[in-house]
Amino acid sequence: MPSSQAHSAVDTPIENHFPGSLFMVVAPSGAGKSTLVNALLAQDPSIRLSVSATTRKPRPGEQHGREYNFMTVDEFKACRDRGEFLEWAEVHGNYYATSRVWIEEQMRAGTDVLLEIDWQGAQQVHRRFANAVEIFILPPSLTALEDRLKKRGQDEPNVIVRRLLAAGSEMAHAPEADYVIINEVFEAALAELRTVVQAARLRYMAQKARHAELFVELGIH
């Protein structure tokens, strides 16, 4: 989700010992996060993208349930008040949120879940899922970041300036991540992202959750 003040909707922390893993990809706008994530999903059918809810208007080409679950402000607030969100934030006058129930259902079923999220949202998710894997995507330079924002043609010049100003404070939180990928050469960055995902799947607790019966049989606790 875009960066702004995030709010935790769940206060009870748990260790993520579900069969499925939870990945969070964080980046400033223009770093190439969505392009990398889409390529990863196309190559790895074992991961499902968590689709955020938002009250903003759809952009050209966006579809409900694919890029976002679009809803009215009243619908959003009703879901929030029922405790259906893991975290939520107000960004530039629009609301965004992550579904808690859906994520837990997927991971219990053994499916890996990936969140495209801002650093503040990642902090809130860690409060619920201590073992979530955070991956921070960085641009190769500030000049490259500005060029990418201009070339994608989605924002007015004043919005681009605002995004560049925000990028500095966002990237200052890269040390909080478990892994950092510099997206200079796309193919190399994608390979690194796939490596991170595979490494996380091989962690002891992740393997134990996926192969619980085997670990019991082998006497491993």
UniProtKB/Swiss-Prot annotation:
GO CC terms of this entry: cytosol
Function description: Essential for recycling GMP and indirectly, cGMP.
Family statement drawn from the similarity comment of this UniProt entry: Belongs to the guanylate kinase family.
Keyword Nucleotide-binding: yes
Reaction equation(s) it catalyzes: GMP + ATP = GDP + ADP
GO molecular function, a single term: ATP binding
Protein name (database record): Guanylate kinase
Coiled-coil ranges from the UniProt annotation: none
Gene, per the UniProt record: gmk
Superkingdom, natural source: Bacteria
